[in-house]
């Protein structure tokens, strides 16, 4: 994921943030462009953060990135993109990997950056609505321990001790002999590579 600061730090500087560590411990601070702009406005124009850049894409008339006041509803933001092109849309707040399903009455907050307008039957909507208990049963039935999920895990690739395939084996078999397998899942960045792309 391009927005994962731990991966970004490695790609730009070659430094690896230790598992569970903070970027500043590696002598690095990561800010996005909008944050830097907001700091500049606060310091030079004495303007607090009262608006947000939001991209509205997918099933809309005119995909657009707009600056809207914080507190604007998602439906109002989607209207600025010409409205939806599907009946009964699902508003997916954030990106496809780490986003969540929101509602039209939900307000834009300081962390809102994108709205994906999707149909009810879209794969991302189905994935977010699925129950974790069903996901675990499905994984237990089909996981062949190929370790592709671990091979593609961005945190594992940086040397962090997370191994999704071993977690799946331990979780589905209810094997608690090696507690570190479970503890190491705290280093997961929730990007979804293991479940959405590798498996």
Predicted regions and their residues:
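Ferredoxin-type iron-sulfur electron-transfer modules in oxidoreductases and energy-metabolism complexes
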Residues: 118-140, 150, 155-199
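Active-site lining segments that contact anionic ligands and/or coordinate catalytic metals
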Residues: 51-53, 63, 88, 112, ...
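A short glycine-/small-residue-rich loop at the edge of a beta-strand within enzyme catalytic domains
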Residues: 26-30, 64-69, 130-144, 158
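Flexible loop/turn segments at secondary-structure boundaries
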Residues: 2-4, 62-63, 75-76, 85, ...
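Structured core elements
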Residues: 55, 65-67, 76, 92, ...
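Active-site gating/interface segments in enzymes
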Residues: 7-12, 44-46, 88-147
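Hydrophobic alpha-helical positions that pack around
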Residues: 1-74, 80-87, 95
């Amino acid at each position: 994921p391009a927005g994962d600061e731990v991966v970004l730090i490695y790609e730009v500087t070659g430094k690896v943030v230790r598992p569970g560590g903070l970027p500043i411990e590696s002598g690095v601070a990561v800010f996005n462009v909008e944050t830097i702009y907001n700091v500049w406005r606060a310091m030079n124009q004495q303007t607090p953060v009262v608006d947000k850049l939001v991209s509205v894409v997918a099933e809309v008339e005119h995909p657009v990135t707009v600056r809207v006041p914080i507190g604007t509803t998602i439906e109002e933001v989607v209207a600025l993109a010409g409205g939806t092109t599907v009946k009964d849309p699902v508003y997916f707040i954030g990106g496809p990997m780490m986003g969540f399903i929101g509602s039209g009455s939900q307000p834009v907050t300081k962390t809102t950056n994108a709205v994906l307008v999707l149909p009810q039957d879209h794969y991302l909507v189905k994935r977010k609505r699925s129950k974790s208990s069903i996901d675990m049963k499905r994984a237990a039935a089909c996981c062949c321990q190929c370790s592709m999920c671990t091979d593609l895990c961005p945190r594992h690739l940086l040397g962090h001790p997370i191994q999704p395939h071993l977690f799946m084996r331990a979780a589905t078999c209810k094997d608690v002999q090696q507690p570190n397998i479970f503890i190491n899942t705290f280093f997961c960045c929730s990007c979804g590579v293991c479940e959405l792309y590798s498996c």
